């Protein structure tokens, strides 16, 4: 059984018919392809739940209440004054990296292109901006409960994580007079107001029913599980490691009066030969860049064809040919689990491969054959190099019998991505065709 189908079956037994799959992201800068694994893992489990007849939603929580943590290289030093302020409440950068007060918010600016990229791979989540959940008062009950049980939560975090919290630690971070959470000390609580003093010597009160502060991450995550009724949220191995935020979130969620999702951990995507993706290290391939090179169904197959607990080597070089070959072979000769000649191991593999093909399609329920566009990846790579115009490619495909009439949108999109790949640094040199433009008289 495919891992997504197995998870859907398990969720049905544990939580019943109603399921909420979730993933999320902090819109602090450019996203990398590593984020795609969490998102597609959750989305594929959601699809598997629907295929199993369950009532399922897929939500995507944007951590827009998270603060700007530092001035990133693409930002001007003017952003120094916004450190500690929620991303939803600070301006997006202009082309020079300066704050643009007339544009989008910082969170919206970086989120938009990412959602466009998700749409290209068939992911259409229900987007929830976390600052709106705070401003609507949905967090208020959880915040009050966390404050009233602060010592119990402190004990959970210190015992499970093995780290000692500061003596002034408080399970709520109010915004100070300058809109930043940094340098703010809580002085008291009278529901619904948290009283504070900030680094500027000013005093004030934050209303927990509004977006005037937020829960620390480990408590925020546990609280949202209950607020949104989340039953499934895959976590990266950093959060899912022993003592990590998932382990502390489970008992905190129960303490706050809700049932947490089962623990589900995925391995990271690594750039082949370069280690895990990391925004801070610069070791990234953006999802938009990847989609300009890789057919979306093959990008989905990269995730669908690997168990969640196995790391993935993301290679936009020669290995892309191999991945495309594997995908095309399975589509052209689909596995048949009902074949009586199969061994038990072969039948399990056939069921798993069938699930991977089903979940790799951009549109749920579509025929995988339609994604091939009538021509193999390798053949198109050859034609795209020796034919300078798209019309010449189409004519060649008509002559070879691969195409009759006009090319469909799938084939046109494939050729566009192929030309992008050939023109990029990622295309393997041993696959590059050098066309001699002049006859050598010697």
Can you say where each PLM-predicted feature lies in the sequence?
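Active-site cores that bind ATP or allylic diphosphates and position pyrophosphate for catalysis
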Residues: 119, 123-288
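Catalytic adenosine-cofactor/nucleotide-binding cores of aminoacyl-tRNA synthetases and other
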Residues: 241, 246, 267-433
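Arginine/glycine-rich "motif VI" loop of SF2 helicases in the C-terminal RecA-like domain
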Residues: 51, 256-260, 320, 338
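Aromatic-acidic/polar surface patches that form glycan- and anion
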Residues: 31-38, 238-245, 292
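Conserved adenylation A10 loop of the ANL superfamily
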Residues: 32, 180-182, 295
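An acidic- and aromatic-residue-enriched active-site/binding cleft used to recognize and process polar
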Residues: 23-27, 61-65, 130-132, 201, ...
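Basic, alpha-helical terminal appendages of large translation-related enzymes
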Residues: 1-18, 30-31, 57-59, 154, ...
